[in-house]
Amino acid sequence: MADLEEQLSDEEKVRIAAKFIIHAPPGEFNEVFNDVRLLLNNDNLLREGAAHAFAQYNLDQFTPVKIEGYEDQVLITEHGDLGNGKFLDPKNRICFKFDHLRKEATDPRPYEAENAVESWRTSVETALRAYVKEHYPNGVCTVYGKKIDGQQTIIACIESHQFQAKNFWNGRWRSEWKFTITPSTAQVVGILKIQVHYYEDGNVQLVSHKDIQDSLTVSNEVQTAKEFIKIVEAAENEYQTAISENYQTMSDTTFKALRRQLPVTRTKIDWNKILSYKIGKEMQNA
């Protein structure tokens, strides 16, 4: 092991550390960071060399953050990235600095949004917040309005998580929806992601995603927002149901075909007593 350490350059060590961090399960960033920190044993190298990994993790995970003085949380996403560590809160029309390691927001300041698409963005946000409140107990959403290739585009992001470290599991739902404001009909594109980590008496991860495409009738802002939410709700309900049914089927068939839940004797073995069983048998035969 010592020989291997000597063979690895600092650049290679940081690259490996960054991969561990980027792939940390939901809610386990700090644990992975602390483990990597011990392995690397060089805080300056880790902070400087793996800073991009901290940022990438938060962007990928749609990390929610609370800004002091404002009621609602906002998501850290690529769509709100203003560069130089600053992010956009489109609802409150502010920008703020975000520390990717501490996951803290500071220095909120007024920020002018793109007025041409703001009325559409606000309508979609209002409808989406009502939907998220109904379907996600811990859900957070952020809606962006921006011009992409000259076209007015709405981007809606949803994040919901449950971190149950005491019960040995953590999970996160993420979804991202986009549509361009065009006359008559627009194409809606979405991606849904689920990631769950269960680690009691084992180590199991569920990582799943689904791409969605649909058509949206574009009329006025309010009606278009309602129709958009109908598409979101139908797709996310279908995805959740399919995941649940699929893993129930796997539990009932595939997993049972691969391995018996109970031994052939249909009796569970108490492994803590297995040694005493053997000793007792030997004493009887003595």
From Swiss-Prot:
InterPro entries membership: CapZ_alpha, CapZ_alpha/beta, CapZ_alpha/beta_2, CapZ_alpha_1, F-actin_cap_asu_CS
Gene Ontology CC, one term: membrane
Any one biological process term the GO annotation gives: actin cytoskeleton organization
Modified residues (Phosphoserine): S9
Coiled-coil annotated residue ranges, if any: none
GO MF annotations, alphabetized: actin filament binding
Disulfide bonds: none
N-acetylalanine: residues carrying this PTM: A2
Record key words, sorted: Acetylation, Actin capping, Actin-binding, Phosphoprotein
Signal peptide positions (record): none
Entry's family note: Belongs to the F-actin-capping protein alpha subunit family.
Quaternary structure and interacting proteins, as annotated: Component of the F-actin capping complex, composed of a heterodimer of an alpha and a beta subunit. Component of the WASH complex, composed of F-actin-capping protein subunit alpha (CAPZA1, CAPZA2 or CAPZA3), F-actin-capping protein subunit beta (CAPZB), WASHC1, WASHC2, WASHC3, WASHC4 and WASHC5. Interacts with RCSD1/CAPZIP. Directly interacts with CRACD; this interaction decreases binding to actin.
Cited function: F-actin-capping proteins bind in a Ca(2+)-independent manner to the fast growing ends of actin filaments (barbed end) thereby blocking the exchange of subunits at these ends. Unlike other capping proteins (such as gelsolin and severin), these proteins do not sever actin filaments.
Protein name: F-actin-capping protein subunit alpha-2
Lineage: Eukaryota, Metazoa, Chordata, Craniata, Vertebrata
Gene that this sequence comes from: CAPZA2
